[in-house]
Structures are given as C-alpha cells and as structure tokens.
C-alpha cells in the first residue's frame, strides 16, 4: 500500500487523542456505578496506557520504516492498522452516540443522563467492535463463490457455456507464508472445472520475496483451456524505496517470472487467440492503467493491434477506471474483468443492496456493470492489504458462464 506522510500520521494521532478524551469523559460517568476505587483506577490506567502505547507505536513505526526489515515492516503495519481501527471506530461511535443523546435528551433528568445515556452508548460501541473483531478473525478468509451468467449476442456458438474463474488481488505478502489458507480457495476453484482462470493483478504487496513457496500452492489451480494474468499497481514495486533502479527492476522481473512457474500466461499489453473448431475469441491483457495518482503502464491499442479481426474479446485490466476511460464506446471489447478496489474490505454486501465508502471514489467498485452491449465485472478480491480484516465484504472467487 502507498505510504502515509508524517503529516497524515500526526493528524491520525490527534484524532485518536480527541476521540479518546471524549470517550474517557463519558467513561467516568459509567464508572460511577463501580464502588471499588481499585477497579475504577485500573480501568482508567488501562485506557490511557493503551492509547499512549498505540500512538507511540504508530509514530515509532513511521520513523523507522525506512530502515526496517521489509517482512517485519509489512507485519507491523497490518497489526497497527488492525489495532487502530478496532480501537478508534467503536470509540468514535460511542462518543458520538452518547454526545448526541445527552445534548438532545428530554426524557431523563440531568443526573440520570450522566449514567443511563453512557450505558446506551456503551452498547452502541460494542456492536462495531464485535463486527470489526469478527471481520478480522472470521470473515477475512471466508472465501465466497459468486456465480453469474452473462449473455452476449456476439459470442461464437462453440464458446457457448464457457466457464471462467476470475480472481484478483491476492496480496500474498499479507498471508505471511501460511500456505494452507488458500487450500479451500483452490479446492473451490478446481471444483468448478473452469475452462479459463483469469487473474487480474496485485499478486504481491511490493516484493518478490513474498512469493517464496507459493508456486507449489498456486500451481494446483487447474483450467481446461488456459490460465492468464495481468499486473496490478502493487506488482511494480512503486510503493517502496529501492537502493537502485536495477534492484527494483530485478524485483519486477522475479514477479513476472513467477507466473511461468505456476503455468499462467502473463499478458503485458498483449493478446492471445483461442480457437475451438474454427471459431475464435481474443483474450487481451494490459499492464496497470489507473487514473492519477496511479501509473498508466497499460497500452490498450497495443494489445488490440493483432486481434482487430476477432469479433469477441475479453479484456483483463486491473483497475476498473480503465473501462470507462478507454474501453466503453471506444472499442468493441465485450467483457472486461477488473479488481483493485477490494470493495474497500468493508461495506454492506447483500443480494439486493450493496454499499461501501469506496463507491465515492470509484463509480465501478464491485459487481457487474453494463453499457449497451459491453460488460465490466469488478471482483472484491481474494486477499487483503492494510487492514487485516473484511467487514461485510467477503473475499471473492467469481464464476462466470458465457452464453449467447
């Protein structure tokens, strides 16, 4: 993930302090119900020891990132991310609910309000805390298959019923070499017996060393007609400091070579033609292309160059922004597959209702989108980065069937 500036870190720490001061004020009211001064003082000390420890840890981590071992760095960032969210969000909700209830209260007397309202607020804080903890320890690896059927007028008849598995955003460094975690995902994928497996980028967080041992795991993925992949923004090493461009390039080459080890064809602004009994479709793949601040390595015209005569095309492009900017109404690409957003790893993801804060940044953030005869599917991703949890946004394996 992209590094935060010291200014943003200081703002975060100030926000934590402000919310904790308000929370502590209302905590004093709740603890009036406790008669033991020892217990009360223990609660107060524990409250501030945690807050001071968290802020100190965040600042120290930021100040030492440049010299820290990369493996340890990634683990510590994720740990502090989880601690910060688990602490800050419930306290913010608690403080907000209690303050609103207290200053708009016309039911309880002032004396009653100082005790009853904070208790109500306490329950309002416990709920998000439970959701966050559940998202960290239970939802993070609860892989979900989403099955959809898409109809195309231009689909060649010999490709009727084509079975595609679409996965994205593995971020293998976040798994900390716990290879068994992906066993169930691989089993779910292979049970579908797909014709194609498409991976749309962000194999790693930053570094090629994250891939150690994963070739034996990912090589188990099976597809009848082929496995294809493209690169995501994290695969270029752009979010790390390197001793030299040569070292950065070496890291990049190792990441690209990994795809050969797991029998995936990496499409770098290229296309591949698949033929069944004389009928053809084209599978295109571009390097990462995103709106600023993301780089635009992708060259769609280059990938289209040798397949203009193939009427049915599938595009693999990591960032869904690419679809709106360069694909829709500018090409005849029938289906585009993307990832990148993770669904923010948080939101409401029901059958008829989907919402996530990420939708205010990305118009196309999760699920199926259509513009005339062109489709885009954005997966919520299989892995995670930053916050070590998923809140209402389970990791996704997409199973797509193509029909006429």
Where are these regions (language model features)?
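N-terminal active-site segment of His-dependent metallophosphoesterases
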Residues: 4-22, 29, 60-73, 119, ...
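Soluble catalytic domains of enzymes that build or remodel membrane lipids, polysaccharides, and related
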Residues: 156-404
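Non-catalytic terminal accessory segments
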Residues: 1-141
